[in-house]
Every structure is written in structure tokens, then in C-alpha cells.
């Protein structure tokens, strides 16, 4: 249908923010006040059996305010931004058809971007090219391939760490297949989101507050049984650190501890540091985000009222 003044786009709400910023609490409170249904936008919460280390909403919270797109994949399975976009659009359409408003809440900014702007026309994976890249990595090391990427696509090389073989391999694969860099292709936007989106970002006013919350929550997760949860995953035998699930913050560090590579104290230290780095990346995304209303997570009542006021205007 062609959009005209007679066919306005239906509303949707984004609640974005760094880890440990109170996004879930705000979303649940909004569900008490607005006709919304919640959709999770989190690349870790999709995995079953990864509850404590991902700070997944509790059973009580999920009973009070069900979240769609939680527990939809086994940790051994992959899940891409394209998968998320397809799933989210389907859930949003169902919510809208039921006369309610989709409220998308989470911190995976790449998913929000894919949903808003569509997906870039990247070539599909080529097993032969991927095998050639992995063979070179086995012979020369990923550092050599990262230097190669620096020459081909310096912008992507700045974003991709040498210790992230999946993303590094994909960036090289895209160039070898298409002759164009990942940076060039990601500038080409796909289909935009057919909704009128109210976008909100919730965060503490200072970095120190984020750091304090992260450290407190990490220790709370450990006290709640994070190590036991990780040991159960480790014992499966089919999971490893090349999988997106086990590369999630906290699980990667726990894996190193369970493998005997680092001590318990070092695991805790690295886990907290990695979570802080994640929050920093999330804040960097958000500071460059267009058309976003900022909310102070230290004033949840005001944040709730602000969202309701904007959405109801």
C-alpha cells in the first residue's frame, strides 16, 4: 500500500540503552500504562539456557510482561541481524494487527539499526572463500589477516578486533566475493521500517554510575549461580568460543576460567571490564543516534512519564 496522509504509519516504541541501565524495568512499567507488547532486542537473550549471565528478565517479570524473541535459539545455533529483522517485523505486525503497540527493548544496537534502516545488500556466505580464509588464518594467524583487512578496508579494521575471527573472516569474505568493501556496502541502506517510531535512550547521567551498576550486577549474577549455569553449558561439549552465544560478555570469560586458562578472580575482573567496554560501545552508538529522546535512569518515575507524554502527544 502506498503511504498517504490517509494511511499513516502505525506507532512503535524503541527503548534503547547500555547494559544495566534499567531498560527492562521501564518497559515493564510502560506495559502497565500503555497498550504495548514487548519485543526483546538482545543478541544474548535469544539463547535458551543462558539466563543468569545474560541478566534475562526473571520468570516473574516475564509472567507480568511477556517478551517476544527470548529463548528462541539453542546456544549452538547462529542468529543474524537479518534473522532478527525478519522475526521482529513478523512480531510487530502481529502486535499491530491486535490493536496494540510494539515496544522494542534492548541494547543490541546493530539489531535496532537493521530494523530501522533495513539490511545492506551483502553477498551470501561462500563456503569455498570462507575455507580459504580460515586456511590462511591457520597457517599465518588472524593478526596477519587483520593487517590485510587494514589495507583493504581500514574503517572496518578499526571496528573489528583481531581476536574476532567471525567478523574478520566475514569482512574479508565480502571483499573477495564482491570486490567491494564491507564499509562501502553497508552505506547502502535497504528497506526502511514501515512504522512511526518513538525512540528513547535510557542511561545513567555519569559513566561512574554505569560502572557501579555493572560491577554490582556482575557479583549478583555470580551469587545467583552464573558459574553453575556456565558449567552446564560447558559440559555439553558442543559449544565453543567461536560461537556467538559463548562470545557473549561474561560467558567468554567464564569459558576461559572453566578451561583452566585463568583464575576465578581474573575471570571476575575480566568479566566486569568486558561488560564496561560493552556499555561504552553501546553509549557510542546512542550518542550518534538520530531523533532519540534521552531519559535519566536515576529518575525512573520521570522517565516513565516522559515516554507516556511523547507517545501520547
UniProtKB/Swiss-Prot annotation:
**What GO terms are given for molecular function?**
ATP binding; tRNA dimethylallyltransferase activity
The cross-references to InterPro entries, in alphabetical order and at most eight, read: Dimethylallyltransferase (IPR039657), IPT (IPR018022), P-loop_NTPase (IPR027417)
Q: Where is this region: Interaction with substrate tRNA?
A: 42-45, 166-170, 247-252
**Binding annotation for substrate:** 19-24
UniProt EC number: 2.5.1.75
Per UniProt, ATP binds at 17-24
Its UniProt entry gives the catalysed reaction(s) as: adenosine(37) in tRNA + dimethylallyl diphosphate = N(6)-dimethylallyladenosine(37) in tRNA + diphosphate
The signal peptide stretch is none
Instruction: Write out the GO biological process terms.
Output: tRNA modification
Q: Which UniProt keywords apply?
A: ATP-binding, Magnesium, Nucleotide-binding, Transferase, tRNA processing
> Site annotation (Interaction with substrate tRNA): which residues?
108, 130
Q: What class of enzyme is it?
A: transferase
Q: Which coenzyme or cofactor does it need?
A: Mg(2+)
What is this protein's function?
Catalyzes the transfer of a dimethylallyl group onto the adenine at position 37 in tRNAs that read codons beginning with uridine, leading to the formation of N6-(dimethylallyl)adenosine (i(6)A).
The family line of this record is: Belongs to the IPP transferase family.
Q: How does it assemble?
A: Monomer.
Q: Which HAMAP family did the record assign?
A: IPP_trans (MF_00185)
Protein name in the entry: tRNA dimethylallyltransferase
Amino acid at each position: 500500500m502506498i503511504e498517504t496522509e490517509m494511511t499513516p504509519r502505525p506507532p512503535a516504541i524503541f527503548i534503547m540503552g547500555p547494559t544495566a541501565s534499567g531498560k527492562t524495568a521501564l518497559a515493564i512499567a510502560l506495559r502497565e500504562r500503555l497498550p504495548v507488547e514487548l519485543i526483546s532486542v538482545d543478541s544474548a537473550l535469544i539463547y535458551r539456557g543462558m539466563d543468569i549471565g545474560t541478566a534475562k528478565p526473571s520468570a516473574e517479570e516475564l509472567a507480568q510482561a511477556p517478551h517476544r524473541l527470548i529463548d528462541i535459539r539453542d546456544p549452538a545455533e547462529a542468529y543474524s541481524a537479518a534473522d532478527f529483522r525478519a522475526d521482529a517485523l513478523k512480531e510487530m505486525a502481529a502486535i499491530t494487527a491486535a490493536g496494540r503497540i510494539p515496544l522494542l527493548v534492548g541494547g543490541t544496537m546493530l539489531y535496532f539499526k537493521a530494523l530501522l534502516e533495513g539490511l545492506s545488500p551483502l553477498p551470501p556466505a561462500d563456503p569455498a572463500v570462507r575455507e580459504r580464509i580460515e586456511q590462511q588464518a591457520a597457517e599465518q594467524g588472524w593478526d596477519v589477516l587483520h593487517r590485510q583487512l587494514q589495507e583493504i578496508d581500514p574503517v572496518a579494521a578499526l571496528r573489528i578486533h583481531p581476536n574476532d575471527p567471525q567478523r574478520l573472516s566475514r569482512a574479508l569474505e565480502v571483499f573477495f566475493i564482491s570486490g567491494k568493501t564491507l564499509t562501502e556496502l553497508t552505506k547502502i541502506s535497504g528497506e526502511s521500517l514501515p512504522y512511526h517510531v518513538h525512540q528513547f535512550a535510557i542511561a545513567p547521567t555519569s559513566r561512574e554510575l554505569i560502572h557501579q551498576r555493572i560491577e554490582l550486577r556482575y557479583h549478583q549474577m555470580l551469587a545467583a549461580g552464573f558459574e553453575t549455569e556456565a558449567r552446564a553449558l560447558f559440559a555439553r561439549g558442543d559449544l565453543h568460543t567461536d560461537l556467538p552465544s559463548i562470545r557473549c560478555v561474561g560467558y567468554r570469560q567464564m569459558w576461559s576460567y572453566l578451561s583452566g586458562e585463568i583464575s576465578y578472580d581474573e575471570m571476575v575482573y575480566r568479566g566486569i571490564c568486558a561488560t564496561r567496554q560493552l556499555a561504552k560501545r553501546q553509549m557510542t552508538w546512542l550518542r550518534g543516534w538520530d531523533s532519540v529522546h534521552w531519559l535519566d535512569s536515576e529518575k525512573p518515575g520521570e522517565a516513565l512519564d516522559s515516554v507516556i507524554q511523547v507517545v501520547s502527544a
